[in-house]
């Protein structure tokens, strides 16, 4: 099942997602807080099977209109009779501060991961499941700090944003270090109850083992939705996006089976579409 997934809508990014086959208790009242405990299977192969022990405590009161949720995931395995995993168990700890405001909300997320969770926390694709035990990542550690939210900026304007910093050391089986940051803003102007114009700007840059990378995107879209809310769905969107590779010429680049570039690319591209 989809188990208490946490995502950032404007970047389609799940920062905590341990969904899978399993069981447990959910939203058990402990005073004013809500406790959830679960055991979830996380892959199986000839060497054995992986599992996630997931514990969460939500609705911890802080200051006015603010609450804290803490989550701990422990990824452990059982080995088959003749099986052996090179990867150790990993820990994933998360803290989420949710702040309600008169014109929207804001969340700040802090996450730390060890071993196979280190590489997940240092990237935008890791959320807690699909733990890799195929190699030794046992000294790895990673973390990320994220701030995001949605707010009204007047009668006709709404905006979503995401700020993120991610870093890690001794990642993967090659033991590399990495760091990166990302800035995304999506303002939306509402013409009426169904039609809106959406603007989006995003920037991502960092380095992997002292090699820089970076990219940016600018999008303009005309959209129609069933309602005037930022979250109104379904939505039909006609868009145009300008993409930039700030360090390389990767757009349209062609590589052979061994990874050698056989046709050079460019450092920018423009795409249009409808969805």
From Swiss-Prot:
Site (Greasy slide, important in sugar transport): 105, 231
Principal subcellular localisation of the protein: membrane
Any Gene Ontology CC annotation: pore complex
Entry superkingdom: Bacteria
Gene3D superfamilies per the UniProt record, alphabetical: Porin, LamB type
Positions bearing the site annotation: Important in sugar transport: 14
Keyword presence, Ion transport: yes
One MF term in the entry's GO annotations: porin activity
Listed InterPro entries: G_neg_Bact_CarbUptk_Porin, Porin_LamB, Porin_LamB_sf
Keywords: Cell outer membrane, Ion transport, Membrane, Porin, Sugar transport, Transmembrane, Transmembrane beta strand, Transport
Alphabetized Pfam families for the sequence: LamB (PF02264)
Compartments, record wording: Cell outer membrane
Cysteine disulfide links: none
Catalytic activity from the UniProt record: beta-maltose(in) = beta-maltose(out)
Its biological purpose: Involved in the transport of maltose and maltodextrins.
Protein family: Belongs to the porin LamB (TC 1.B.3) family.
Quaternary data: Homotrimer formed of three 18-stranded antiparallel beta-barrels, containing three independent channels.
Protein name per Swiss-Prot or TrEMBL: Maltoporin
Lineage: Bacteria, Pseudomonadati, Pseudomonadota, Gammaproteobacteria, Vibrionales
């Amino acid at each position: 099942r989809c188990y208490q997934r946490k995502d950032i809508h404007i970047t389609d990014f799940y920062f905590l997602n341990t969904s899978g086959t399993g069981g447990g208790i959910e939203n058990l009242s402990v005073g004013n807080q809500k406790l959830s405990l679960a055991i979830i299977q996380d892959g199986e192969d000839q060497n054995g099977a992986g599992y996630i022990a997931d514990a969460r405590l939500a609705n911890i009161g802080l200051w006015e209109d603010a609450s804290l949720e803490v989550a701990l995931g422990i990824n452990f395995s059982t080995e088959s009779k003749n099986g052996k995993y090179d990867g150790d168990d990993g820990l994933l700890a998360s803290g989420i501060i949710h702040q309600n405001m008169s014109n929207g909300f804001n969340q700040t997320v802090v996450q730390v991961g060890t071993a196979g969770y280190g590489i997940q926390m240092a990237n935008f694709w890791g959320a807690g499941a699909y733990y890799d035990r195929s190699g030794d990542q046992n000294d790895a550690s990673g973390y990320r700090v994220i701030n995001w939210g949605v707010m009204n900026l007047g009668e006709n304007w709404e905006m979503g944003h995401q700020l993120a910093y991610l870093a890690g050391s001794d990642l993967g089986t090659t033991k590399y270090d990495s760091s990166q940051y990302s800035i995304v803003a999506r303002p939306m102007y509402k013409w009426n109850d169904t039609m809106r114009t959406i603007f989006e700007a995003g920037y991502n840059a960092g380095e992997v083992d002292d090699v820089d990378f970076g990219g940016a995107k600018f999008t303009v879209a005309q959209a129609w939705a069933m309602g005037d809310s930022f979250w109104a769905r379904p939505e039909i969107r006609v868009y145009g996006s300008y993409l930039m590779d700030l360090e390389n010429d990767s757009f349209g680049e062609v590589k052979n089976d061994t990874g050698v570039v056989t046709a050079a690319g460019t450092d920018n591209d423009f795409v249009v579409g409808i969805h």
